[in-house]
From Swiss-Prot:
NCBIfam families: PRK13694.1 (NF010247). This is UPF0335 protein Caul_0876. It comes from Caulobacter sp. (strain K31). Belongs to the UPF0335 family. InterPro entries: GapR-like, GapR-like_DNA-bd. Coiled coil: none annotated. Pfam families: GapR_DNA-bd (PF10073).
Length: 89
C-alpha cells in the first residue's frame, strides 16, 4: 500500500505539497483546540450545576443569545400562536 502512495506524491509540486501539509497541520491543531475548548465549556457547565443553576436552561439561554433578536421574537410569536391554536396557552 505504501508503494501505491509514493507515485501520487509526484503529481503535486513541492509548493503544493508544502501548502497541503500546512493546511492539514493547521486543521489538526484546530481540532485539538476545539476538543480543549469543548472540555472547558463542559467544566463551566459543571461549575454552574454545582452552584445550583439548571444546565439545560443555561444551554438554551446561550443558544437563544446566538439568535438575532428580531428572528427570535418572530419565532416566539409563531410558537405562541401554535400553542394557542392547540389550547396549550
Amino acid at each position: 500500500m505504501a508503494d501505491d502512495a509514493a507515485p501520487h506524491a509526484d503529481v503535486l509540486n513541492s509548493t503544493a505539497q508544502g501548502q497541503l501539509k500546512s493546511i492539514i497541520d493547521r486543521v489538526e491543531r484546530l481540532e485539538v483546540e476545539k476538543t480543549e475548548i469543548a472540555e472547558q465549556i463542559k467544566e463551566v457547565y459543571l461549575e454552574a450545576k454545582g452552584n445550583g443553576f439548571d444546565v439545560k436552561i443555561l444551554r438554551k439561554v446561550v443558544r437563544l443569545r446566538k439568535t438575532d433578536r428580531a428572528k427570535r421574537q418572530e419565532e416566539d410569536a409563531i410558537l405562541d400562536l401554535y400553542l394557542s391554536a392547540i389550547g396549550e396557552i
